[in-house]
Amino acid sequence: FCSSASVYGVEYSSDPKKEDFLLKPVTRYASNKADAEAFFVEAHKKDKFPITILRPSLTYGPKLGMYRQISTDPSWIDRIRKGKPILICDDGSARCQFLHVDDAAYIFVSLLGKEECFGEVYNVVHKKPYTWKEYHIEAMNVIGKKVELIEVSFKDLSKFKIPRFGLCQDYTSHDAY
């Protein structure tokens, strides 16, 4: 079952989160994933249902494009290309992990049908976490253009009540892996 690292919620600051941590989801998406996990775990315990639960981190690939800390809007790449500054939440020190879809697919396929993995839960994350500031700087390096990163407090971002900033509230303003 494909769950999500978002089931851990935002309270943990442990580096990294472990599979046996208590689930504390804060979004409907994460709550639904946690509920599904509980259903499958119970089915495994009761009836030996053959389930392996995988919790991938922020997964990206050719269809989704590049994440951004404060929204899913891809215009930030264009802003960098044009030399315009971009916003980051707080000081950009919240950590995140990214997982390419090809790596996720490899892991998923490699576990298919492995009886020794039934009833187990695995975090599926990249081995190195990045801060959002490091991530944005790396994107600038790839594009070949440096722009100013404007730090805006989460509190100030929240005042605008812009729906696309919900990602920041629910996930990316916290250590998210």
Question: Where do the protein language model's features map onto the residues?
Answer:
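Flexible, glycine-rich beta-alpha linker
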Residues: 52-72
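Active-site Tyr-X1-5-Lys
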Residues: 13, 24-53
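The catalytic Tyr-centered alpha-helix of NAD(P)H-dependent dehydrogenases
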Residues: 28-32, 56, 69, 100
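Substrate-positioning beta->alpha
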Residues: 68-76, 82, 89-112, 119-120
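Residue-level signal for the nucleotide or nucleotide-sugar donor/cofactor binding architecture
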Residues: 99-102, 130, 174
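Conserved catalytic-site region of short-chain dehydrogenase/reductase
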Residues: 2-15, 28, 59-63
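Mid/C-terminal beta-alpha module of Rossmann-like enzyme folds, strongest
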Residues: 82, 110-170
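A short C-terminal helix-loop "cap" of Rossmann-like NAD(P)-dependent dehydrogenase/epimerase domains
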Residues: 59, 75-89, 145-150
